[in-house]
């Protein structure tokens, strides 16, 4: 089975590692992969999709989020992080499979409609989220979270083993080891997590150096900073994904680079929660570290729109550095090809053999005008938002077509919102 995406006004993507913009492009998709650009497959009986008045680009990867936390959108929004977390954690003790499923579905609808084709998620009841992922057909990296302050680590390990076994051969679900943080997970559990990562060959995904309080707490307890602590325990490797890093020291950057660990920047959430600090994007890039971008959860962002997040990442870096060293192509790479690298997939590009996760934007959208080859990338990063998305394919399957799905998904989102309000209303003042 395949598609011919025919006569796109523009195709913008990474081809052989270089950013290319191709006018009047035709892209062939076969068996879930990119088969080529401009290569005829019309005789194979593939379905042609007329892409006139559209821009073809790779799907966006949300490299860190908490999908079911649409449950908490607008919940104690203006509280600082410690108070906000205490309110959230109080409600999370009452969660169940059904409410996590409903909240996951609401978020996944939002992601699909705004051009996200894959995401990494850290939350409770990952089975509920996985079921919704498979229903809608996008990709996700998932796994039960280790968080000793709330859950028995032995129980989490059993859940992880079952989850990893169930989805070991899935094309869309990638099991991961989720770890909340070094301040909620004890030393013995972290050592066990390292053993599990080696045994199961699964990546570890963890919040690290997010706040000043976290850094001071770990330094006070162990006489080292969080990244140093993880390194001392043997967790620092190419299988480690570090989220936030707003309060990381210069020498810890060298540890990250040497280990080949991946990092994820979540700018909007960090600003909204007033965690301050600074994500050292330029220094990490100069060291060759792979950087992804994530929205964080819809409770702390409050949007899951990766177009907005790309723009915010550039703006925050420029505000911090007082220059324009971080450019549109840096964050476009982070949200596409780097995101897929973090997932362990060859994607985010139009090379032959890349996974066929692509998005079509409406090139007549006023946000994109005036439109030329020289300003196309700038317009995508700085001007548009997810409302420009007209069509989404994941794994070579058409999972969203605005003309077909838009109103039905909006109505479904409203119904899910009402279901969520029935649950969360019990915890409101």
Features from the language model and the residues they span:
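Metal-coordinating catalytic core of metallo-dependent amide/deamination hydrolases
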Residues: 128-247, 251
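Active-site gating loops and adjacent loop-to-helix segments of metal-dependent hydrolytic enzymes
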Residues: 71-102, 109, 136-147, 212-239, ...
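C-terminal cap of metal-dependent C-N hydrolases
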Residues: 355-410
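His/Asp/Glu-enriched, well-ordered alpha-helical/loop segment
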Residues: 232-239, 281-364
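N-terminal metal-binding scaffold of metallo-dependent hydrolase/deaminase domains
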Residues: 1-43, 54-55
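Acidic, glycine-enriched loop/beta-strand segments at the rims
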Residues: 12-24, 273-275, 340-377
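Divalent metal-binding segments
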Residues: 52, 79-125, 181-189
């Amino acid at each position: 089975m395949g598609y011919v995406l025919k006569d796109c006004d523009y195709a913008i993507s990474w081809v052989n590692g270089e950013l290319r913009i191709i006018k009047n492009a035709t892209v062939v998709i076969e068996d879930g992969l990119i088969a080529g650009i401009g290569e005829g497959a019309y005789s194979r009986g593939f379905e042609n999709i007329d892409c006139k008045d559209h821009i073809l680009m790779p799907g966006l990867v949300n490299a860190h989020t908490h999908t079911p936390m649409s449950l908490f959108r607008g919940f104690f929004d203006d509280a600082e992080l410690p108070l906000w977390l205490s309110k959230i954690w109080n409600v999370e003790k009452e969660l169940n499979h059904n409410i996590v499923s409903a909240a996951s579905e609401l978020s996944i609808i939002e992601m699909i409609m705004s051009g996200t084709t894959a995401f990494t998620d850290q939350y409770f009841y990952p089975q509920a989220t996985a079921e919704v992922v498979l229903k809608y057909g996008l990709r996700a990296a998932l796994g039960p979270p280790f968080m000793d302050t709330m859950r028995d680590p032995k129980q989490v390990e059993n859940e992880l083993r079952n989850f990893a076994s169930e989805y070991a051969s899935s094309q869309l679900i990638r099991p991961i080891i989720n770890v909340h943080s070094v301040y909620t997970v004890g030393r013995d559990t972290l050592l066990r997590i390292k053993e599990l990562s080696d045994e199961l060959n699964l990546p570890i995904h963890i919040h690290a150096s997010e706040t000043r309080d976290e850094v001071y707490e770990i330094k006070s307890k162990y006489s080292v900073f969080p990244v140093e602590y993880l390194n001392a325990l043997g967790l620092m490797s190419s299988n480690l994904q570090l989220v936030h890093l707003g309060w990381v020291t210069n020498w810890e950057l060298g540890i990250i680079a040497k280990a080949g660990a991946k990092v994820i920047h979540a700018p909007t959430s960090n600003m909204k929660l007033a965690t301050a600090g600074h994500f050292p994007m330029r220094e990490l890039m100069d060291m060759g570290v792979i950087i992804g971008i994530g929205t964080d959860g819809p409770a702390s962002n409050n949007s899951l729109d990766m177009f907005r997040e790309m723009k915010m990442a550039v703006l925050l870096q420029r505000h911090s550095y007082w220059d324009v060293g971080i450019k549109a192509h840096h964050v476009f790479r982070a949200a596409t090809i780097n995101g897929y690298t973090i997932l362990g997939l060859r994607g985010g590009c139009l090379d032959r053999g890349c996974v066929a996760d692509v998005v079509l934007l409406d090139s007549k959208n006023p946000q994109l005008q005036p439109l030329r080859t020289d300003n196309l990338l700038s317009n995508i990063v700085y001007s548009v938002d997810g409302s420009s998305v007209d069509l989404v394919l994941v794994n070579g399957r058409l999972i969203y077509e605005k003309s077909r799905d838009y109103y039905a998904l909006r109505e479904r989102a409203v119904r899910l919102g009402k279901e969520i309000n029935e649950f969360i209303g019990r915890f409101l003042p």
